Structures are given as C-alpha cells and as structure tokens.
Amino acid sequence: MQQLKLNNGVEIPILGYGVYTITDDKECERCVINAIETGYNHIDTAAIYMNEPAVGRAIKNCGKRREDLFITSKLWVQDQGYDMAKKAIDESLKRLGVDYLDLYLIHEPMGDIYGQWRAMEEAYRQGKIRAIGVSNMYADRLCDFLYHVDIKPVINQVRTNPYFQHIDTFEFEKENNICLLYTSPSP
C-alpha cells in the first residue's frame, strides 16, 4: 500500500481502517483481522471507542508481525494535563498489548492540551510513540499551538468531506509540513 512520509520521517499508509463504531469486542476483533487480511495495515482506534483490547487481540492473532502494522490511538479529553496523559498513554499500550504506537493523537483540543502534549513528547522521546499529532484542530488553534510546543505535530486528523472542506486548515498545514488526515468522509 502506498505510504506518505511524515515530517519526522515515519511513513504512514494512505488508507487506514477505523474502528470508531465497532463496540462489540468479538465483532471488532473479527473486523480488524478481516481488514488486515484484505490489505489494510493501518488500524485507527481511540481510548474513547472502548475497543482497544479487541484491537489488541486482533493485532496479536492476525498473523502479521507488529512492525508490519501501523497502529493509531487517541487521547480523550478526560485525560487532562501531563500526569493523566502519561497514565493514559501507558494504559492504551497495555490495552492494545503493544510496546509502542505508531501514531498517537490528542483527540479533541480541549482543556490542558499543552500538558497532554508534553506527556506525548516525552513518550515520543522514550520510543513509546513513533509519531504524535492532533485531531480536530483547525488553523487558528493550530497556529497558536505550534508556538507553544517543542515537537511539531506530524498529523492533524480532521473530519473532511464536500460540506466540510477546511481549506484554511489545509493550506496552513501544507505551509507547516503537517499532514492532513481525513476522517469521516460522510456528510
């Protein structure tokens, strides 16, 4: 599958399989294994989806080596600040049964996102996360964010479709070498 090189050198598959609405554990595990068998190697989950354990079992049982998969998860808003974010990162790793995540995102830019980001930068430096980014952050907020962090986000995952094009955000990201990751293409 074709890949894109992020601003830190990590390569991400251009297509990913998201498990947002798959809440039944057995169904989630089966769907992820089926997705991997059909050629997806990027699996996108999040703490709030409450299916990280099922995704972890699928990773373990899919027959592929961990390094051949690209796993994304996200930090939810209840994990405000540095300490809560550090704990949440470790809990996601444990639930998924992996030693590292390929990509970890702030799911919603609310509350103490700077404390969350510091914890993510630390986990990145420790090798627990290969790439860090944000989600649902639009141009004005992203511009301010870049002035207050040490490591620039590699990705901004934003709901995008013909009705929500976010041209200003796309242009800002292009100028700042931040990849726009589209999600939820339906209106």
Residue ranges, per PLM feature:
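N-terminal binding-site loop/beta-alpha segment at the start of enzyme catalytic domains
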Residues: M1-L69
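Acidic/glycine-enriched edge-of-secondary-structure segments
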Residues: I14, I43-A46, S73-Q80, R130
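Conserved, mostly hydrophobic/aromatic
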Residues: Y17, I43, V55, I71, ...
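Short glycine-centered, acidic/aromatic-flanked micro-motifs in structured strand/loop junctions
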Residues: V19, T45, S73-L75, I106-E108, ...
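Glycine/proline-rich, positively charged
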Residues: T23, Q80-D168, K174, I178-L181
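N-terminal, well-ordered alpha-helical segments
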Residues: I33, P53-R57, S73, K87-D90, ...
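A generic structural signal for well-ordered alpha-helical segments
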Residues: A35, E173-K174
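Conserved small/polar residues in nucleotide/adenosyl-binding loops
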Residues: Y182-P187
